[in-house]
Structure formats: C-alpha cells, structure tokens
Curated annotation (Swiss-Prot):
Similarity comment: family membership: Belongs to the RutC family.
Any one annotated GO CC term: cytosol
PANTHER family per UniProt: 2-IMINOBUTANOATE/2-IMINOPROPANOATE DEAMINASE RIDA (PTHR11803), 2-IMINOBUTANOATE_2-IMINOPROPANOATE DEAMINASE (PTHR11803:SF39)
Pfam families for this protein: Ribonuc_L-PSP
UniProt superkingdom: Archaea
Gene3D superfamilies: RutC-like
Cited PROSITE patterns: UPF0076
Stated name of the protein: RutC family protein STK_08110
Matching CDD domains: YjgF_YER057c_UK114_family
Length: 125
C-alpha cells in the first residue's frame, strides 16, 4: 500500500490521504473545489467548482502514474440536484469516450460549504 501526495492538489482538510495506491488500483479521497495555490474554495457556480475538483483529481491520479482514462468508478456528491445538468456538462468534458461508472447523490452539506465533492477509484489492467 502506497500513500499518494502531490502539491499540485489541495492538502486534505482532515486526517486522510489524497489517495492510496494498492497494486493496480488507486483510491482517491473525496475532493472539493479547493485551489491548491490558495488553499481556499474557488468562488463560482457549480461549473467552476466541478472544473476545480476534476483538475485536482487529474493531478492526484497523474502523481500516482494513472490518468483520467483509468477512472473506473466515480462517487459524486452535489449540494443541490438542480445543479445536475450544469455539473454533467463539465464532467462530460473530462470523460468523453468511455465515462466511468458513477453514483451521484444530493447531500445536505459538504466540507467548507462546497457545492460538490467527487471521489474516484482507478484501475489499470
């Protein structure tokens, strides 16, 4: 088991790792829209926040030797399901050809009052 950390993604806001690599599988902790340069939530709508979350995930999987095409499963937590279509429009830019399996649920609140959080599982082979 290997801990994955990159300065190109935000530091965890609690006692957990950015990601854990076990063999050919990578477990990426839930990411919220924190700009790693400022350590603050990005200001903006669900599209802006989704883009930041996916950029953070992209950097974490890259640091572990994976890519977004290796994402097998995504877990998405939205503050408001009315944001679903706008979220999907940005999400589709990152997962064009073979999107991963996905769960999307509405939650009452997220850390730092983010609008979105995404966790992923990647697999090679």
């Amino acid at each position: 088991m290997e801990t994955v950390f990159t300065e190109k993604a935000p530091k965890p806001v609690g006692p957990y790792s950015q990601a854990i690599k076990v063999g050919n599988t990578l477990y990426v902790s839930g990411q919220i829209p924190i700009d790693p340069r400022t350590n603050e939530i990005v200001k903006g709508d669900i599209k802006v926040q989704t883009r930041q979350v996916l950029d953070n995930i992209k950097e974490i999987v890259k640091a572990a030797g994976f890519s977004l095409s290796d994402v097998a499963m995504a877990f998405v937590f939205l503050k408001d399901m009315n944001m679903f279509n706008d979220f999907n429009s940005v999400y589709a830019e990152y997962f064009k050809d073979k999107p991963p399996a996905r769960v999307t649920v509405e939650v009452s609140r997220l850390p730092k009052d983010a609008l979105i959080e995404i966790a992923v599982i990647c697999s090679k082979g």
